[in-house]
Amino acid sequence: GLRDFNVAVRASNGKYWTRRPESGTLV
């Protein structure tokens, strides 16, 4: 979904856990 896409983008920037750790899909 769109959320997963945004998560992927944030993860690539290393700010995934900083923004939304509860969605922990990639990590």
UniProtKB/Swiss-Prot annotation:
Reading the lineage from the top rank, the first entry is Eukaryota
- Entry keyword set: Nematocyst, Secreted
Compartments it resides in: Secreted; Nematocyst
Residue ranges annotated as coiled coil are none
Query: Where does the signal peptide begin and end?
Result: none
Secreted keyword on record:
yes
| Keyword Secreted appears in the UniProt entry | yes
For this record, an example GO cellular component is:
extracellular region
The remark listed among the other comments is:
Does not have hemolytic activity, phospholipase A2 activity and acute toxicity in crabs and mice.
Q: What is this protein called?
A: Cationic protein C1
Q: Which organism is it from?
A: Bunodosoma caissarum (Sea anemone)
